Amino acid sequence: MSGALKTAAAVLRATGEPLSVEEVDLDPPGRHEVLVRIAASGVCHSDFNAASGASATALPAVLGHEGSGVVEEVGEGVSSVVPGDTVVLSWLPACGRCRACTSGRPELCEGAMSQMVTGS
């Protein structure tokens, strides 16, 4: 893909205001990035906190970081998925080295859990 792709996104422009579905530009995938055609997306409590102002969020913000879909394109250096693969998105990347990751349970990544709880 060359140039930006037009896509729809749920955009928060101001806390306490409704999200607006807008057409936005999406750059092609960069190094270690994957372009996914979203089939389903969830809005979770952290999105609610951003929208209500309960957590500091740079605005405007695209909400709905939980999702699944099909890989459309991969950037340089991506070897774990190929176009056509069905994927579930993770908002916090797994380290790939801890006991949970090496035993096939990246959703329980010790590093990711620590980062989520402590921010470190």
Please tell me what each predicted stretch does.
Residues G3-A10:
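Short structural boundary motif marking the start of a folded domain
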Residues V11-P18:
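Extracellular beta-rich ligand/substrate-recognition surface
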Residues D27-S41, A51-T102, E107:
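Glycine-rich beta-strand-centered segment in the early N-terminal region that forms part
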Residues C44:
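Conserved Rossmann-like nucleotide-cofactor binding loop
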Residues T57-L59, A112-S120:
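Short cysteine/histidine-rich metal-coordination sites, predominantly Zn2+-binding motifs
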